Amino acid sequence: MTVSTAQMRFWSPEVRELEPYVPGEQPKIQNLLKLNTNENPYPPSPKVVEAVQAVLHEQADALRLYPDPDATALKQAIAKQQNIDVSQVFVGNGSDEVLAHIFKAFFLQDEPILYPDITYSFYPVYSQFFGTKTKEIPLNESFEIDVRDYTQPNGGVIITNPNAPTSIALSLAEIEQVLQANPDRVVVIDEAYVDFGAESAVSLINRYENLVVCQTTSKSRSLAGLRVGFAIAQSHLIAALEAVKNSFNSYPIDRFAIAAAVASFEDQAYFEEQCQKVITSREKLVRDLTELGFNVLPSKANFIFATHSQHDAGQLAQKLREQGIIVRYFNKPRINQFLRITVGTDEQNARLVQTLKQDIL
């Protein structure tokens, strides 16, 4: 939508300066192979479907009532699955909302927060929105984080692990180095993709009072359409997030989403099976693309980050699009020759590889 300067006079000065996040494309194309937004290629647990249907058919009258503002059943399910106390769980309308509350609750400091120069592109948006000072720390030439860079004075640290979009993961030992170097600042580990092979920092929660771990049900639990995210931390940090949430929206998660997420956490076997299928497919996709001349960064996510020395990434993305395959291209410094490709089913990955082999490369 185009808005004229005259119309913008109704906007606040802060909003006029905002550079909003641009979500991944959701095109309406027939026979589209969508590998651009890291959605799970498999459906949620059948128990999730049953739970949603139960709300509709057995609890329909309850839809006239507000949902539980604390989403107690969901917090209990998460706490049980993670082997932590309910007081250590915060839930929100997707991890993006949880992250926004984290920025408001912990990062308004006099010194800049630290995050990598290549990271989840919502972080600069939140920083601008909340007026948070920032300092971007360059990844090294291998696109890895050097944790020694995060020992300098700061107003907080946020790291995506595994990194998005590079897919490279830190070890728990490296995360501990960052935590130990910042005892008086909150360190946030954004684990949207952790279930596909990385180490979760949740195991460190009881040892570090400055740690917040943020996760989502969108990727590994196939619930991107229902918007459920959560944070795990010691109770004094959770209390701050609850205060922020209840100053914005006391009912962020609806009855359907609560029921679906609870069912997902209760079906651990299905969850583990689907994660392993994605991991296995990822390794085969990496081998296939490597044989085609791609350099693929080591991935612990449900996507890969790949470049080809003989082909421009932007042109590759456009040629794939012409063949009905959408991948994510970032026209940004340092990564403008890479494609981020979501891991699909084996059949979907085979279509991608065959299209590259026969029609593009």
Curated annotation (Swiss-Prot):
Question: What cofactor is this protein dependent on?
Answer: pyridoxal 5'-phosphate
Where does this protein act, in terms of pathway?
Amino-acid biosynthesis; L-histidine biosynthesis; L-histidine from 5-phospho-alpha-D-ribose 1-diphosphate: step 7/9
Tell me which stretches of the chain form a coiled coil.
none
**Pfam families found in the cross-reference section:** Aminotran_1_2 (PF00155)
Superkingdom? Bacteria
Query: Subunit arrangement?
Result: Homodimer.
Descriptive protein name: Histidinol-phosphate aminotransferase
